[in-house]
Amino acid sequence: MSKLGVVLFTLLLLVPLVTPERDGGKWTMLAKNKKAMKRNLMDFITRTCDPYYCNDGKVCCPEYPTCGDSTGKLICVRVTD
């Protein structure tokens, strides 16, 4: 048997030993956290930017990156020196 075959066979034997009941759910929690992190990252990446308003969870575009308050409305502005 090749080295890869031995490693795969060993991993197959260890899988039943690491179940959520025996490890206190640590592996399950890690998998769930990883999925949530991926989902949040994809939500952030796919979120479209708004060049004018930054309320209701909208994100300002890079051209006007700063969210500022103008008479109660949150607008995207560019701060210059």
Curated annotation (Swiss-Prot):
Gene Ontology cellular component annotations, sorted alphabetically? extracellular region
Q: In which tissues is it expressed?
A: Expressed by the venom duct.
Q: Which UniProt keywords apply?
A: Disulfide bond, Knottin, Secreted, Signal, Toxin
Compartments in which it is found: Secreted
Q: Which residues form the propeptide?
A: 21-47
One GO MF term on file is: toxin activity
Q: Where is the signal peptide?
A: 1-20
- Provide the disulphide bond pattern: C49-C61, C54-C67, C60-C76
Give any Pfam family that matches. Conotoxin
Name the family.
Belongs to the conotoxin M superfamily.
Free-text comment on this protein's domains from its UniProt entry: The presence of a 'disulfide through disulfide knot' structurally defines this protein as a knottin. The cysteine framework is VI/VII (C-C-CC-C-C).
Name of the protein in question: Conotoxin Im6.1
**Source organism:** Conus imperialis
